Amino acid sequence: MSDPQNYGKQPKDPNKPMKERMLAGELYRIDNVLEQEQDLTAKWLARLNDSSCSSRSERQQIIRERIGAMGEGCDIRPPFYCDYGSNIFMGKDVILNFNCCILDVVTVTIGDGTLFGPNVQIYPADHPRDKETRLEGWEFGRPIKIGKNVWIGGGAMILPGVTIGDDAIIG
């Protein structure tokens, strides 16, 4: 679990694996492990995004292969984009409309009954403010939590570290 005190900081253990750093919201760089996971996700996304003519149940089977958690009645309407998929946790009856992008370098939690309009962008990924650190390829993330029964209108952008309460309307 990420600790807000550590967002964007180097971990105390310099040998901590990059994936653990990433998930903790600490500074990390893409290494071979993360690159391989991104490659697997890219292949999964190609299958998911080719499934637009498939039935909803077939698409849900594909979605469940990679998404961290998905309650009953959820759907992602292709095309869909994400970094890993495994850090996205959706409650039940969540609908992500066309062209949603989630940069899930840390957890993105979406509550029951939440609806995304087309072109919604969820961006927990962040970058150091210090130019030298940023140019060395370091990055970090801050989790996003979206409550229950939220409606995020088309084209809305949610930035790192945001929490949206239950029943909110954004957009």
Predicted features by range, described:
Residues 1-73:
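Terminal amphipathic alpha-helical/low-complexity segments used for targeting or macromolecular assembly
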Residues 9, 69-72, 92, 148, ...:
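Intrinsically disordered, low-complexity regions
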Residues 29, 157, 169:
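Short, electropositive, low-hydrophobicity segments enriched in small/polar residues
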Residues 53, 57, 80-164:
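Flexible, glycine/small-residue-enriched loop-and-beta-strand segment within the central core
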Residues 164-171:
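C-terminal/domain-terminus segments
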